[in-house]
A protein has these predicted regions:
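Basic- and aromatic-enriched surface patches that contact anionic nucleotides/nucleic acids
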Residues: 2-12, 16, 30-255
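Positively charged, structured surface patches that bind polyanionic biopolymers
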Residues: 26
């Protein structure tokens, strides 16, 4: 009998299951999932900002299968959210922006270098954002170079570098603490236990009022899981190949 069971997954667990397809506890993308229509940078930014602010971000829908004692969760709905979570967990600095640096922080930096012009805030933001974007973590970084660059940029003596390092270190350690907190954030998951053959229909119903699918995505979503077809339209074939190549390049295993 079909039914749904709620489960709680941390974002770290979700990310790990999405990217490590060799584990005994993994998530795979079904054939009916859509490839285009994936979130743009602004949608991803808004989603991560919601996590940072503790906003609800909806649920994920999985279908659980067990074969040879290996649990596999088919991702029925929530691909865009899952992909964005995986990106953030692997490289949180990708989601660090100029706006992540407060005016108060900039004011403290300027106080150290004995400047007091709010128009200089953008210099600090640009310099530190460029620095952190080159990293893939906020953890255990060395801040001598950006501190030295700030001191030189504002014509301050090198004797202020120590204070700059301390202030910058404290700031990015707070970002690491925030990352650790988000990694442990729980996202609700619904696990469906009905007939696997109904998954494309469930997917279609869930997404019928969301972002409209184009005609090729509708074709893909309508294909039965266990049936094969010969497609003579080369445009459709090329589209489908490109779609699943994109999934593979993102590290997903196609089910």
């Amino acid at each position: 009998m079909a039914g749904c069971t709620p489960e709680n997954w941390s974002l770290q667990e979700l990310s790990s299951a999405l990217q490590d397809t060799h584990k005994d506890h993994k998530i795979v993308v079904p054939m009916f999932q859509r490839g285009s229509g994936r979130w743009g940078k602004e949608q991803e930014r808004t989603f991560i900002d919601s996590l940072i602010k503790g906003y609800p971000v909806g649920t994920m829908l999985f279908y659980k299968t067990v074969e040879n004692n290996i649990e596999t969760y088919i991702l029925v709905d929530g691909l865009q959210r899952g992909n964005c979570i995986r990106k953030y967990m692997n490289n949180p600095t990708e989601f660090f922006y100029d706006s992540s640096i407060s005016d108060d922080f900039c004011k403290n930096i300027l106080k150290i270098v004995k400047r007091n012009n709010e128009e200089d805030y953008h210099i600090i933001r640009t310099l530190l954002t460029d620095f952190i974007k080159k990293q893939k973590t906020f953890k255990n970084l060395q801040y001598y170079n950006p501190a030295k660059e700030i001191a030189e940029k504002f014509g301050a003596g090198y004797e202020c570098i120590g204070d700059l390092i301390t202030t910058i270190t404290d700031f990015f350690e707070e970002r690491q603490d925030l990352y650790d907190s988000i990694a442990n954030t729980i996202i609700p998951v619904i696990v469906y236990s009905g007939d696997e053959a109904t998954l494309p229909e469930i997917f279609d119903r869930i997404n019928s009022k969301g972002t409209p699918l184009d005609k090729y995505e509708i074709y893909a979503a309508a294909w039965p899981i266990n049936e094969k077809y010969t497609i003579s339209n080369t445009r459709i074939v090329e589209y489908v190949i490109a779609k699943y190549d994109a999934f593979v390049s993102d590290g997903y295993k196609i089910y």
